[in-house]
Amino acid sequence: MRRGERRVAGGSGSESPLLEGRRSTESEVYDDGTNTFFWRAHTLTVLFILTCALGYVTLLEETPQDTAYNTKRGIVASILVFLCFGVTQAKDGPFSRPHPAYWRFWLCVSVVYELFLIFILFQTVHDGRQFLKYVDPRLGVPLPERDYGGNCLIYDADNKTDPFHNIWDKLDGFVPAHFIGWYLKTLMIRDWWMCMIISVMFEFLEYSLEHQLPNFSECWWDHWIMDVLLCNGLGIYCGMKTLEWLSLKTYKWQGLWNIPTYKGKMKRIAFQFTPYSWVRFEWKPASSLHRWLAVCGIILVFLLAELNTFYLKFVLWMPPEHYLVLLRLVFFVNVGGVAMREIYDFMDELKPHRKLGQQAWLVAAITVTELLIVVKYDPHTLTLSLPFYISQCWTLGSILVLTWTVWRFFLRDITMRYKETRRQKQQSHQAINNGDGHPGPEDDLPGTGTAEEEGTTNDGVPAEEGPSAAS
């Protein structure tokens, strides 16, 4: 929504938020409605600057004779023109801070990335890998073999110099990356249980797929102590504390020039990088079959996106420390939060004609396209059969989940309806026996048993006072 369309507090004497249409999980917002130059779309300004830049390149700059350079420059210029159009003209998403144009930019980057993936998908395996040389000449060569796992002793008595060398070897740059990554994922998902399930499930996936990717082979304490408990667990804990603060925060906004003090202005600038309002996510997966399947789908896509990170590096011959790997993670950090909010709104929307948000649609398409690239570029690795005990564990887990689903959303409801019907019948029979029920069919017939039950004759005379009694 545009800046001028946001909720504005009404009345000059009191700050009363507009509560109409606000969900119970959504925070109250006070806004004075200031619409400054900063919030405008600047469509004509961007068009003028873009036209001047293109005119300068066309009329004043000499075109180089290097075909490869001109090709790269033309592709980059085409992408920049598309980004300029999208940033000024694309539809706004659910987020507006620090600026709606920021999120429109990442939406357009999503389109560019998806088109790039489609291009790679339609190349041969050799051409696709060699094409990356145009991005970085160091790419397009097979990755060297590395030794993973190795000695898993926490205390290595044979190493007299440093018995804990195995632990220090694991304390690399991936430790803060795990912590920061799960802190940000918690801000996206906004649910402790879902975060922990995804964290634990991914470790099980690493166990299951280490025969396909050697870098999944880690020590047991690296999986469960360093990853799940320390890095991931601490990131989730800090993320939940941040969510608690955001849900309790007062969202009161004033225009920068309406604040009299310099301290207030600086505070307002800092708060520009915090949410405009806050919605507490209540996924409630067990409330209905629809929400249960949706939450399972979200977890599946999350795990698939995590696996794509490692498989894409493997099949495209990309070193883990390459900047393209980092850029992909930065990309998903920015688009993931918007996608999760759009999915939650889609699930929470009661309108009959719902539409999935644009960013969520693109994230799903990107995740599937990445998987298809992995399948096409190295089918041999993906078809390596799981060890028998691993496949047994996943089969048992799938049966348990399927059994719980059938019981919770089908058998349990049938059983509860049967018990409720039986209880109502018992209450009805008990009420009739106690004389508190409604008249039955026989009670509508005149003179049938009514006199005997009431101790009267059919003429309404008490039985003791009738002719037989007098005689």
Swiss-Prot record:
Recorded superkingdom: Eukaryota
Reaction catalysis annotation: a 1,2-diacyl-sn-glycero-3-phosphoethanolamine + L-serine = a 1,2-diacyl-sn-glycero-3-phospho-L-serine + ethanolamine; 1-hexadecanoyl-2-(9Z-octadecenoyl)-sn-glycero-3-phosphoethanolamine + L-serine = 1-hexadecanoyl-2-(9Z-octadecenoyl)-sn-glycero-3-phospho-L-serine + ethanolamine; 1-hexadecanoyl-2-(4Z,7Z,10Z,13Z,16Z,19Z-docosahexaenoyl)-sn-glycero-3-phosphoethanolamine + L-serine = 1-hexadecanoyl-2-(4Z,7Z,10Z,13Z,16Z,19Z-docosahexaenoyl)-sn-glycero-3-phosphoserine + ethanolamine; 1-octadecanoyl-2-(5Z,8Z,11Z,14Z)-eicosatetraenoyl-sn-glycero-3-phosphoethanolamine + L-serine = 1-octadecanoyl-2-(5Z,8Z,11Z,14Z)-eicosatetraenoyl-sn-glycero-3-phosphoserine + ethanolamine
Glycosylation (residues): 159
In-chain residues carrying the UniProt-annotated modification Phosphoserine: 12, 14, 16
EC number: 2.7.8.29
Record PANTHER family: PHOSPHATIDYLINOSITOL SYNTHASE, PHOSPHATIDYLSERINE SYNTHASE 2
Protein topology in the membrane: Multi-pass membrane protein
Keywords attached to this entry: Endoplasmic reticulum, Glycoprotein, Lipid biosynthesis, Lipid metabolism, Membrane, Phospholipid biosynthesis, Phospholipid metabolism, Phosphoprotein, Transferase, Transmembrane, Transmembrane helix
InterPro entries attached to this UniProt entry: PSS
Name recorded for this polypeptide: Phosphatidylserine synthase 2
GO terms of biological process kind: phosphatidylserine biosynthetic process
Lumenal compartment segments: 62-74, 126-291, 335-354, 403-471
Cytoplasmic domain ranges by topology: 1-40, 96-104, 313, 376-381
One Pfam family, short name: PSS
Organism: Rattus norvegicus (Rat)
Residue ranges of the region described as Disordered: 1-26, 423-471
